[in-house]
From Swiss-Prot:
HAMAP family: IspG. This is 4-hydroxy-3-methylbut-2-en-1-yl diphosphate synthase (flavodoxin). PANTHER family: 4-HYDROXY-3-METHYLBUT-2-EN-1-YL DIPHOSPHATE SYNTHASE (PTHR30454), 4-HYDROXY-3-METHYLBUT-2-EN-1-YL DIPHOSPHATE SYNTHASE (FERREDOXIN), CHLOROPLASTIC (PTHR30454:SF0). The gene is ispG. SUPFAM superfamilies: Dihydropteroate synthetase-like (SSF51717), Nitrite and sulphite reductase 4Fe-4S domain-like (SSF56014). It comes from the Bacteria. It catalyses: (2E)-4-hydroxy-3-methylbut-2-enyl diphosphate + oxidized [flavodoxin] + H2O + 2 H(+) = 2-C-methyl-D-erythritol 2,4-cyclic diphosphate + reduced [flavodoxin]. It comes from Yersinia enterocolitica serotype O:8 / biotype 1B (strain NCTC 13174 / 8081).
Length: 374
């Protein structure tokens, strides 16, 4: 029930990764990357399926060898989401996966050899209508740039990015996006700010090698939150030393918190104190797990007492305000006659949320059908 995001997004060109639009006002996409051995087709496909279940838009797969390229062919055949092939050094791998239907190539043109080889890859991408991501990383800058700046700086990452952009510009290829990732939040943020002023191509956001699930999520939320709040960014990946499924969840949570793109339940819950009339923490934890399958955007407030509960419920799709034995229930900001038994709160609230989601989905389908009929 909250208003749309006030963020004005940076204007950028449009590319397509498979059928997924990126840039030019398209919804900001959430990506992840497999961490299985690509040659283990079954394990890689299983991980992609798990990512699909939590709503991933695009998945990147490392393709370091020709054997991995052959495996990629089989993986692609069994995947429903667009796949990006991550390739370094050997340009022939890029040519091979292009034959196998890759949706995007993640390369740095400067590290795959001579201009003739670069031209071969770009011509192949052009022929198959495959976009390219230029992926600059603070940990792998070119030797001459490292010597020039002494250490990774925003200016160093920008120079590296523009060097690769210029290569594609000279080859008259404009179907690309760019990233300038670093593990340091300030370095990454300031690098993206500089790059956003130089080009109008879509930008892929990320804090690279951010850390474990907790610390990496915090770094990513701060870094990407700063950029997204300034309108910078067209697609993102949360880089965690954790299950890739967690990357997708955190990515959507960041977009949801800025009201940029909502997917599933936005829980509003108090940290609890001695005034709570039911087990708020247990209720929230249980419902987050039970309702992971819902994709309908909804605000659900779960507040343990009447101090802030009614106010939060007024701006929530579903709201609960704690009271002794039986807690107050709100729907669309209106208090209902029905009350929840505090001992059966979880089951009752889950049922109400699912029923509301079904109703909202049905209403949306009616609106879509009416628009299509026009």
């Amino acid at each position: 029930m909250h208003n749309e995001s006030p963020i004005i997004r940076r204007k950028s060109t449009r590319i397509y990764v498979g059928k997924v639009p990126i840039g030019d006002g398209a919804p900001i996409t959430v990506q992840s990357m497999t961490n299985t051995k690509t040659t283990d087709v079954a394990a890689t496909v299983a991980q992609i399926k798990a990512l699909e279940r939590v709503g991933v838009d695009i998945v990147r797969v490392s393709v370091p060898t020709m054997d991995a390229a052959e495996a990629f062919k089989l993986i692609k055949q069994q995947s429903n989401v667009p796949l990006v092939a991550d390739i370094h050094f050997d340009y022939r791998i890029a040519l091979k996966v292009a034959e196998y239907g890759v949706d995007c190539l993640r390369i740095n043109p400067g590290n795959i050899g001579s201009e003739e080889r670069i031209r071969s890859v770009v011509d192949c991408a052009r022929h198959h209508n495959i976009p390219i991501r230029i992926g600059i990383n603070g940990g792998s800058l070119e030797k001459d740039i490292q010597e020039k700046y002494g250490e990774p700086t925003p200016e160093a990452l920008l120079e590296s990015a523009m060097r690769h952009v210029d290569i594609l510009d000279r080859l008259n290829f404009d179907q690309f996006k760019v990233s300038v990732k670093a593990s340091d939040v300030y370095l990454a943020v300031n690098s993206y700010r500089l790059l956003a002023k130089q080009i109008n191509n879509p930008l892929h956001l990320g804090i690279t090698e951010a850390g474990g699930a907790r610390s990496g999520s915090v770094k990513s939320a701060i870094g990407l939150g700063l950029l997204l709040s300034e309108g910078i960014g067209d697609t993102l990946r949360i880089s965690l030393a954790a299950d890739p499924v967690e990357e997708v969840k955190v990515g959507f949570d960041i977009l949801k918190s800025l009201r940029i793109r909502s997917r599933g339940i936005n829980f509003i819950a108090c940290p609890t104190c001695s005034r709570q009339e039911f087990d708020v923490i247990g209720t929230v934890n249980a419902l987050e797990q039970r309702l992971e399958d819902l994709i309908t955007p909804m605000d659900v407030s779960i507040i343990g007492c009447v101090v802030n509960g009614p106010g939060e419920a007024l701006v929530s799709t579903i709201g609960v305000t704690g009271a002794r034995n039986h807690s107050g229930f709100y729907e669309d900001g209106v208090r209902q006659r029905e009350r929840f038994d505090n001992e059966k709160m979880i089951d009752q609230l889950e049922a109400k949320i699912r029923a509301k989601a079904s109703m909202l989905d049905a209403n949306n389908r009616i609106v879509i059908n009416m628009l299509e009929e026009k």
